[in-house]
Amino acid sequence: MHTLIERLEKVTNSKELEEARLNALGKKGVFADKFNQLKHLNGEEKNAFAKEIHHYKQAFEKAFEWKKKAIIELELEERLKKEKIDVSLFNAIKTSSSHPLNYTKNKIIEFFTPLGYKLEIGSLVEDDFHNFSALNLPPYHPARDMQDTFYFKDHKLLRTHTSPVQIHTMQEQTPPIKMICLGETFRRDYDLTHTPMFHQIEGLVVDQKGNIRFTHLKGVIEDFLHYFFGGVKLRWRSSFFPFTEPSAEVDISCVFCKQEGCRVCSHTGWLEVLGCGMVNNAVFEAIGYENVSGFAFGMGIERLAMLTCQINDLRSFFETDLRVLESF
């Protein structure tokens, strides 16, 4: 059994080490054979031989562990000599991209803030006055219906648009006012083009009566849409909103078909992007403003993002499918 340790000392690699282990400790190894011989012995001779086997087995196992450690260190040293690593090589780090909605928000803010518009933030939970009454939305208006608005038991509600921020701003400040507000809004809709939670951006400019005209509104809107969509055509249409008078909606030439007609634009060649108008005097009266004029505009951030990212299903923005989000 002395030869087992002598053989172990001559081992130079992992393969030889494993062969030495199996030869000594395997099921058909030397020590297994020695233990089988015990059944042919009796009495003191059997006990003495068993002690001798255990002694050599423990000595071999101790020598094996020492040799194993030495072999591991030796092979690691040899591998490091062969494998050269160039630490100067640049390892590109995969970076994430902005969510389409965040990108759209930032792009909008980058346009308006240099023009002097102040970003205002409001509460998601509002009362009837700020969300409806102050905006010339009477009690019988369909927007107040339980099927369209999320109500709480204490007569509070989740804001259905960002317009309440305009009301709070006018209550807290005096003209001239030049502000934008953006954030989450809530309505009870869920389909390809509607979700219970969505984002809006609204703007408001108020000054002394006569200082703000529709031409000012038209200039701001046209500059913004050309900044955001590039060289698109614009179409203004008269419309109706309770909180503006006169009111208008603005369309852009279809960014998908270039006005040749497609499913997205319903083969009209035009896409609706925002609503706007001169602030209704009823709104100013609710606030307590006198001798002022102003304009307001609003648009859906998801709507703008869908057009720039060419997304057909609005719900894609709120799902965690990285295959979709990483494509932008």
Swiss-Prot record:
Its EC number is 6.1.1.20. Mg(2+) binds at E245. It comes from the Bacteria. GO terms for molecular function: ATP binding; magnesium ion binding; phenylalanine-tRNA ligase activity; tRNA binding. One of its GO terms (biological process) is phenylalanyl-tRNA aminoacylation. Its main location: cytoplasm. Keywords: Aminoacyl-tRNA synthetase, ATP-binding, Cytoplasm, Ligase, Magnesium, Metal-binding, Nucleotide-binding, Protein biosynthesis. The keyword Kinase does not apply. Tetramer of two alpha and two beta subunits. This is Phenylalanine--tRNA ligase alpha subunit. It comes from Helicobacter pylori (strain ATCC 700392 / 26695). The gene is pheS.
